[in-house]
């Protein structure tokens, strides 16, 4: 699936941004920096969007479970979105950050999807193809892709629930790896976030082990940096589990937009499965 995407964020938030697009506030999180290179923010259908939960329901209603889904779209390696899609496919390939406008390099990705004359698919190789293409370009060396094993997502939710149940530390979001260039980040590294919650080594180790089953290391690829059109620069990657999460704080009383995001996040299936 190739499109503009915002991970787990609901269409209602996107629609409101679209409606005010001609008069956006200077502090709108989703405001592209003028003159920034293009990422896959194009092709909108007159401001009409679909929630990932709606996509998952449509696939479920079809009675089809795909072998895999490949998202050539920004921010779709979001654990909240992946969890919604856990019954839609056996595997998912997606990027945790923005995808450059050129998209995935299909001249190399397609052969990986039809390996051995079509007898099998090599999704880890498809992730590697994305990385290798962007790592070799002269500018905007920004290419990240991760493979998800969908049958492991519910056990991952249980592992995070166990961490949340015994969480002893407050997470300082500014210390976490983020995957967007917005002033207030929306997409943080899931593994680093979970480990920041707990001082319990056993729970932390159990979570990391489940992460490796859910997101096999041989299917996690990233360039040294990622580009974001929201700050118009390359951003360092110092920690990469390949999947993002929203990192909540208790309240955003002074920020109506962020409070709305927090409220919406608390309606996700992932939140319901992992809250303490």
Regions found by a protein language model. Name each.
Residues 21-23:
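Glycine-rich, acidic and aromatic/proline-enriched surface loops and short helix-turn segments
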Residues 2-14, 30-276:
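Terminal, contiguous helix-loop blocks that mediate binding/assembly
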Residues 26-27:
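A generic structural signal for short coil/turn motifs at secondary-structure boundaries
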